[in-house]
């Protein structure tokens, strides 16, 4: 199953993305989601296949969501994931002596 997908980024939340089928555009995205997401900003288009690897999403789940509901919402990583990647020096910078 090959799908051409448009990916939009959220102007409100860093690293939040909305995947939609390019042919459908945003018409299948629920109205209630857009106030939370903000006005979608087109990032890029991508051909999705079951064999394709995505950095932070399960391709099977993305394709299932596109078929069943017409969109897939990629949430930003948890704050803890950001903190784990900071150098120890930055994590201790404001520690009391």
From Swiss-Prot:
Domain YcgL: 3-87
InterPro entries: YcgL-like_sf, YcgL_dom
Listed PROSITE patterns: YCGL (PS51648)
UniProt cross-references to SUPFAM superfamilies, sorted A to Z: YcgL-like (SSF160191)
Superkingdom of origin: Bacteria
Pfam families: YcgL
Gene3D superfamilies given in the database record: YcgL domain
Name of the protein in question: YcgL domain-containing protein PP_4590
Organism, as annotated: Pseudomonas putida (strain ATCC 47054 / DSM 6125 / CFBP 8728 / NCIMB 11950 / KT2440)
């Amino acid at each position: 199953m090959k799908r051409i997908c448009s990916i939009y980024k959220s102007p409100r939340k860093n690293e939040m993305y909305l995947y939609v089928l390019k042919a459908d555009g945003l018409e299948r995205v629920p109205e209630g989601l857009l106030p939370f997401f903000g006005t979608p900003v087109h990032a890029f288009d991508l051909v999705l296949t079951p064999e394709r690897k995505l950095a932070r999403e399960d391709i099977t789940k993305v394709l299932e969501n596109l078929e069943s509901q017409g969109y897939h919402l990629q949430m930003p990583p948890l704050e803890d994931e950001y903190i784990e990647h900071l150098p120890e020096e930055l994590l201790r910078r404001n520690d009391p002596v």
